């Protein structure tokens, strides 16, 4: 398996973990009765749960680009050291982004986000 596909697998695992953590803290902050019910009415959640939700939404905004780039690189066989480094940068920056966002660290969070975009750029440039 290519480096890019390996990091795609890691990104999928991160997505599942992120969803589980976010859902757990959201349910805890809203109450077990709400979590087990139809959830028709909106309820306030804790700051922590809200940050987890926004961090997940942010991850979902960049993940499709990563999936597409990793797939194109694997299918076309155009993987290079640069694309592998881009995949690693994207993944590890996204891992770093979660605790930075949840703990409210603004500057480092933004740096992690930019590094993840730089990783996507490193993956895309050799394909052009």
What does each model-identified segment do?
Residues 1-21:
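Long, highly hydrophobic alpha-helical transmembrane signal-anchor segments
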Residues 10-13, 56, 88-92, 111, ...:
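Hydrophobic residues within alpha-helical transmembrane segments
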Residues 14, 57-72:
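Core segments of transmembrane alpha-helices
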Residues 23-53:
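Cytosolic, membrane-interface loops and tails of multi-pass inner-membrane proteins
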Residues 43-64, 100-102, 106:
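Membrane interfacial helix-start motif at the N-side
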Residues 78-89:
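Structural signature of hydrophobic alpha-helical transmembrane segments
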Residues 95-118:
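Interfacial loop-to-transmembrane junctions
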């Amino acid at each position: 398996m290519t480096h890019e596909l390996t990091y795609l697998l890691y990104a999928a695992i991160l997505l599942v973990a992120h969803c589980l953590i976010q859902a757990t803290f959201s349910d805890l902050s809203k109450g077990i009765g709400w979590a087990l019910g139809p959830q028709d009415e909106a309820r306030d959640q804790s700051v922590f749960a809200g940050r987890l939700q926004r961090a997940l939404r942010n991850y979902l905004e960049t993940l499709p680009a990563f999936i597409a780039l990793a797939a194109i690189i694997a299918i076309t066989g155009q993987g290079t050291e640069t694309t592998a480094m881009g995949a690693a940068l994207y993944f590890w920056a996204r891992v770093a982004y979660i605790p930075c966002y949840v703990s409210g660290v603004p500057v480092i969070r933004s740096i992690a986000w930019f590094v993840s975009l730089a990783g996507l750029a490193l993956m895309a440039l050799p394909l052009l």
